[in-house]
Amino acid sequence: MTILDDILVKTRQVIARDQASVPAAELVAAAKDLPVCRDFHGSLAATDQVRLIAEVKRASPSAGLIREDFDPPTIAKSYEDGGAACISVLTDEPFFQGSLDYLRQVRSAVDLPILRKDFIVDPYQLLQARVAGADAVLLIAECLSPQQLIEMDEQASELGLQTLIELYEPENLAPVLATKTRLVGINNRDLRTFETDLQHCVRLAADIPSDRLVVGESGIRTAADVAMLKAGGIKAILVGESLMRQPDITIATKALLAS
């Protein structure tokens, strides 16, 4: 069993637990009175500069605990002050020590568009995201069949949520492009082994049509990395761990975007 297989087993257990606590019907009712979502794609497409999705991330399977003084609202505000265009909040509990409560806290702290980053395999998680205050959700091609990708993208749109659809394997690019998403994420980390290669997204970006905005994910640490990705056609980046480890997140965010 790969790491990803294990993650998906645990994810389905968490979904079952949550559904027993809060039925989908309650979330559907709660979602009806919510304000319109912020424009996640628009925030990333606003300028020709590489735009940053800054991630609120407590831990990971590969790195363990990333930051001791973990206060999601403070971290998100630091990202906003540093020039981030959007915020990503990791909500996976078993492997990343995340929580939907963190997303709710961040929503109350900043006005930037927010992404729920999790291993989304069930429409129930889309409802959770919308009610918690997310404006967009991450879908992962390696976690869903081509038909499921299309259906989940459509269901997210019906809730007013935008999607960032991520892939690692080149053969998953066609299924991603078969959806209506405008945001295609290329993960430099193989979710099966957790090894990273920063050039991976540059190689795949060449095959993505210009009407899709490409987001580079994982392994991005320096302004030089950002400059290299920009030269390779990457329009936005998602960065978490390297910023979360810095003593002053605002200064680190500004430095990363200085390219």
Swiss-Prot record:
Q: Decide whether keyword Coiled coil is in the record.
A: no
The UniProt record lists the keyword Amino-acid biosynthesis: yes
Which GO molecular function annotations are given, in alphabetical order?
Answer: indole-3-glycerol-phosphate synthase activity; phosphoribosylanthranilate isomerase activity
User: Under which pathway is this protein filed?
Assistant: Amino-acid biosynthesis; L-tryptophan biosynthesis; L-tryptophan from chorismate: step 4/5
Taxonomic superkingdom: Bacteria
Q: Which reaction does it catalyse?
A: 1-(2-carboxyphenylamino)-1-deoxy-D-ribulose 5-phosphate + H(+) = (1S,2R)-1-C-(indol-3-yl)glycerol 3-phosphate + CO2 + H2O
**Matching SUPFAM superfamilies:** Ribulose-phoshate binding barrel
One GO process term, biological-process aspect: L-tryptophan biosynthetic process
Disulfide feature = none
Q: What class of enzyme is it?
A: lyase
Family matches, as Gene3D superfamilies: Aldolase class I (3.20.20.70)
Task: Write the record's keywords in alphabetical order, separated by commas.
Answer: Amino-acid biosynthesis, Aromatic amino acid biosynthesis, Decarboxylase, Lyase, Tryptophan biosynthesis
Q: Which residues form the signal peptide?
A: none
Stated EC number for the protein is 4.1.1.48
Q: Entry's InterPro entries?
A: Aldolase_TIM, Indole-3-glycerol_P_synth, Indole-3-glycerol_P_synth_dom, Indole-3-GlycerolPSynthase_CS, RibuloseP-bd_barrel
What family is it from? Belongs to the TrpC family.
What is the name of the protein in this document? Answer: Indole-3-glycerol phosphate synthase
Question: What is the species listed in this Swiss-Prot or TrEMBL entry?
Answer: Rhodopirellula baltica (strain DSM 10527 / NCIMB 13988 / SH1)
